A protein has these predicted regions:
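WD40-repeat beta-propeller superdomains and closely related acidic/aromatic-rich repeat-like regions
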Residues: 1-161
Length: 161
């Protein structure tokens, strides 16, 4: 199938692509080993590795889906699911550049920040105008920006601690 998106592992260990068929395909670059990650109800349109490369965080379900890239990688391991937004489809994800925190945007316009270890959720924006279509942290991690399909944009200043 055709590729919808691509993400590189931060240490250069792997490359992962989102496919037309609601799957992810990855390759370990050292040996070319093929990895398939499936089970999504819809196409994955957004994915990002955590800063340390331990997790691949993805949209495409009503929760935030994370695949482990420790040890031998995601094959044979179930994904970890982080909380969602009341059944709304996760449309965008972004990984914090210095902390183990994921930002996730949803089809209902909500933006959540989720601590990977504790699973604590911080609502950033709830039910704004349309699905979240853009989401990014600033390079220093002190701001989070988002945009919706209806043209709303937002930028939130985050505490430095």
């Amino acid at each position: 199938g055709s590729h919808l998106g691509i993400v590189m592992h931060p240490q250069g260990d792997a490359v992962v692509t989102a496919m037309q068929d609601n799957d992810l395909h990855g390759w370990r670059l050292a040996d070319g080993h093929n990895m398939r990650m499936s089970g999504y109800p819809t196409k994955v349109r957004s994915m990002a590795f955590t800063r340390d490369g331990k997790w691949l965080v993805t949209s495409g379900a009503d929760v935030v889906v994370m695949w482990s890239f420790t040890g031998s990688g995601p094959m044979g391991k179930p994904p970890v699911e982080l909380p969602g937004s009341g059944g709304a489809l996760c449309t965008r994800v972004a990984c914090h550049p210095t902390q183990d925190v994921v930002a996730a945007g949803f089809a209902d316009g909500s933006v959540l920040m989720i601590d990977i270890e504790t699973r604590r959720v911080l609502p950033v924006s709830l039910n704004q105008g349309g699905a979240i279509t853009a989401l990014a942290y600033s390079p220093d991690g002190c701001m989070l920006g988002f945009g919706t399909e209806e043209g709303l944009i937002g930028a939130v200043t985050l505490a430095s601690e």
